[in-house]
Amino acid sequence: MNLAVPAFGLSTNWSGNGNGSNSEEESVLYQRLKMVEELWERVLQSECGQELVDLLTELRLQGTHEAITSEISEEVIMGITQRIEHLELNDAIRAARAFALYFQLINIVEQHYEQNEQQRNRWEASQETNFYEQAGNEEEMVPPSRLGASTEPLPVGIDQNELQASVGTFHWLMRELKRLNVPPQHIQNLLDHLDIRLVITAHPTEIVRHTIRRKQRRVDRILRKLDQLQGSVTGRDWLNTWDAKTAIAQLTEEIRFWWRTDELHQFKPTVLDEVDYSLHYFDEVLFDAVPELSKRLGQAIKETFPHLRAPRANFCYFGSWVGGDRDGNPSVTPEVTWQTACYQRGLVLGKYLFSLGELVAILSPSLHWCKVSQELLDSLERDRIQLPEIYEELSLRYRQEPYRMKLAYVTKRLENTLRRNNRLANPEERQTMITMPAENHYRTGEELLEELRLIQRNLTETGLTCLELENLITQLEVYGFNLAQLDFRQESSRHAEAIAEIAEYMGVLTTPYEEMAEEDKLAWLGVELQTRRPLIPQEMPFSERTRETIETLRTLRHLQMEFGVDICQTYIISMTNDASDVLEVLLLAKEAGLYDPATASNSLRIVPLFETVEDLKNAPGIMDSLFSLPFYRATLAGSYHSLKELQNQPPDYYQIPTTTALLNPGNLQEIMVGYSDSNKDSGFLSSNWEIHKAQKSLQAVAQSHRVILRLFHGRGGSVGRGGGPAYKAILAQPAGTVDGRIKITEQGEVLASKYSLPELALYNLETLTTAVIQASLLKSSFDFIEPWNRIMEELACTARRAYRSLIYEEPDFLDFFLTVTPIPEISELQISSRPARRKGGKADLSSLRAIPWVFSWTQTRFLLPAWYGVGTALKSFVDQDPVKNMKLLRYFYFKWPFFNMVISKVEMTLSKVDLTIASHYVQELSKPEDRERFDRLFQQIKQEYQLTRDFAMEITAHPHLLDGDRSLQRSVLLRNRTIVPLGLLQISLLKRLRQVTQEAETSGVRYRRYSKEELLRGALLTINGIAAGMRNTG
């Protein structure tokens, strides 16, 4: 098999901007890209014929444009468009499918390369001293860990991209902390209360089927096998070995099977389908990755600070919204949430049972050759009495093997636990289930842990170590019996509606609740929250919506009783506008038995979510009013008694992170900040600045009330929804707001890119953990320089005005958006259990969710939400004093982590924008009578883009976009060269589809040649392909 020549168009001498040579590692990447590309071509040739391959070759070669900042010419666009317009629908669909498959294959190769690169970087970091020590110039350098970047030149021989690759690992971090003379006791204090929580969410635009994800993993495994073969065979003939030929044949067949598989969901997934999808990442990767993360951190600490203790094993913990998030999703019912908890427990118990089977094979020591403690012998005797059937079955086989006998009892109890869980998942059996004897199964993971630790102690006392047993214990410490904590979320208006209906039925208010002023609501709610008298009658004669709201809190209570409090402690209130929104949920929690007014004890953490810019501005005042209520403060402390003890402590007691009382979850308030709706509301720059300010203010309010704050960041996958590299984002948080605690959403769309492969998962978890420790110990003071804050306030206000003047004040913009983007067709995708609009809203921007909003602009190559308004803001500031202010903005970029993060995200987004393609969406999808007004809007967008791009390149001093991130630059350029034809295919299919739809609506006559369903399928396939090509949905 000859793989020496690529099928088409990948330049082998590209180095990011066209001026340089590839590294050895990039050469390996391009070898794999060529191989996969040629196999893709061969499969298409055999499946569809040479004519399709020739068509794809022609379209791709015409669409190729080299530089990352250049746009394809109108002449080329017209040539491709004319070719596409003459395609039969079946050929257009096949072309769309082929391009989508191509991009997904390229993604796998890149992801595979990234995984190898991350392994190599980690190994180098563990072997070498840091770069500054190698260069012998450390005294003169300002560490990038503190500043985000430095204006001083790097030491001789150190490349900026090389330096970036070295940071983010535990070994690098610990050496950096030592180099900066951070006191070991400060490091230990932080490690002792390190608390990182990652929350998996379902994603309304998660476009890739589960079936396709499995194929992606199989392709990756074959690529890994080829890497091993290439590394083990010397010389250039490794491709001619029998093993290599076999692997390439397997890869060819995987691509062939993929081509013959439907890319689109054939039905709208249920919530439980989404639960299954999210649990897959735990099953395949995360179950083993998180314990490995703990080991890696412990090893790095030991090598640099041998006297420090590693953090507890579950310092990084996963939660989930899938099955618990009912905001705007009527499909998430109490029964679905219960089923989700059972599914999670069933998966983790099955993993433990498999591990126990492995231990039985390993732990074979005999009493003939080793001793065991009396404690273990006593436990075996108790087991014999409690589980006599196991003794009768296995006592002869294991009579001299105490560990195997013990594991047999443990296995039986765990099997009974799993059997009981399966019956709990069945609604019919749940009602009639006979309770098992307590000694025959485990109620909690801690009970199983005690038995495994008993075995571990015996092994240690006799000089034995079992790595597999240690791994299982760590997994139990991390995942328990629930795998992930379920967060509940509901919109604030649902609780207000329920309280209003309850109050009206009970006749307890003279004024309807919904008409009361905020201070009157707080007064009445305060009274109700300080009495044990129930408010809700048992029969619940209310509307279905109110009954469901009440039942949700009761289900939460039942889940805690059956699965333990850890299964669900968090209740998030979206669209929190007032303090009463929080107290309404607390009142419903009281009625469900989750809160006792007499003692203030409770088992629920209520989390307000502030999403819009207005809510973010009001958030500090809302929390101040809540913290000022004695009964609310007592709920945070855990009880009135605990609050009194805390108030008797000295003032600085609450400012010292070493105090163990601060680790008490009862003294903690979690607050969530939303990136998606604030961005949609006010634009990228304003949103980021308002969130930054709100965090500082919330931290100050919490500290003034002696409350510990944990900020929950609702970051999306795209830049327009707060996405981007987590490492930079965490370092850009205001100083003092992280302090070893952070909670972040991991959106469904990014799960595959972060957690589909073990080393990728570990890399993401390690860089995230490194950033949290780094941000907590090396705090930047730049966030508190008042003149800088005033400048950012000015920039944010100007950007917000520019953004809203287009999005909300331009009367033609809504029509423009609905016409030139595929938002109507996106709603047809069978990809989510949740509707695209809130409350079944009408076609306006206020009801449209942020995710399809961003998804639509990404498809059309505008990517508008992630940059619009930034250029106007920067120009307005620079024009006041061009030389001085441009110098100041550059200084911000190189010194201030927050500003660096903002500009870096804008730069990355601009690299993906192609307004030449976007203009064709406008020209081809607009009606003749709309073109003049739509062209005016497009010219306004184009002017803002050019302005933003020019300023981004000027501030960063990059001759080309992304010159500071070679890997990302390479990836973006690779896609920009190929995605053009797919966008034009989408335009053609959308145009045909809308024409057919319009004719059917106006005349009732269907377009005879192609049905609406056929055209819709073709359009959806292009949406699928562009999402893969952009590596982004919403």
From Swiss-Prot:
<feature type="active site">
    <location>
        <position position="203"/>
    </location>
</feature>
<dbReference type="InterPro" id="IPR022805">
    <property type="entry name" value="PEP_COase_bac/pln-type"/>
</dbReference>
<dbReference type="GO" id="GO:0015977">
    <property type="term" value="P:carbon fixation"/>
</dbReference>
<keyword id="KW-0120">Carbon dioxide fixation</keyword>
<dbReference type="GO" id="GO:0008964">
    <property type="term" value="F:phosphoenolpyruvate carboxylase activity"/>
</dbReference>
<keyword id="KW-0460">Magnesium</keyword>
<feature type="active site">
    <location>
        <position position="680"/>
    </location>
</feature>
<dbReference type="InterPro" id="IPR033129">
    <property type="entry name" value="PEPCASE_His_AS"/>
</dbReference>
<dbReference type="InterPro" id="IPR021135">
    <property type="entry name" value="PEP_COase"/>
</dbReference>
<protein>
    <recommendedName>
        <fullName>Phosphoenolpyruvate carboxylase</fullName>
        <ecNumber>4.1.1.31</ecNumber>
    </recommendedName>
</protein>
<keyword id="KW-0456">Lyase</keyword>
<dbReference type="InterPro" id="IPR018129">
    <property type="entry name" value="PEP_COase_Lys_AS"/>
</dbReference>
<comment type="function">
    <text>Forms oxaloacetate, a four-carbon dicarboxylic acid source for the tricarboxylic acid cycle.</text>
</comment>
<dbReference type="InterPro" id="IPR015813">
    <property type="entry name" value="Pyrv/PenolPyrv_kinase-like_dom"/>
</dbReference>
<dbReference type="GO" id="GO:0005829">
    <property type="term" value="C:cytosol"/>
</dbReference>
<dbReference type="GO" id="GO:0006099">
    <property type="term" value="P:tricarboxylic acid cycle"/>
</dbReference>
<dbReference type="Pfam" id="PF00311">
    <property type="entry name" value="PEPcase"/>
</dbReference>
<dbReference type="GO" id="GO:0006107">
    <property type="term" value="P:oxaloacetate metabolic process"/>
</dbReference>
<comment type="similarity">
    <text>Belongs to the PEPCase type 1 family.</text>
</comment>
<dbReference type="GO" id="GO:0000287">
    <property type="term" value="F:magnesium ion binding"/>
</dbReference>
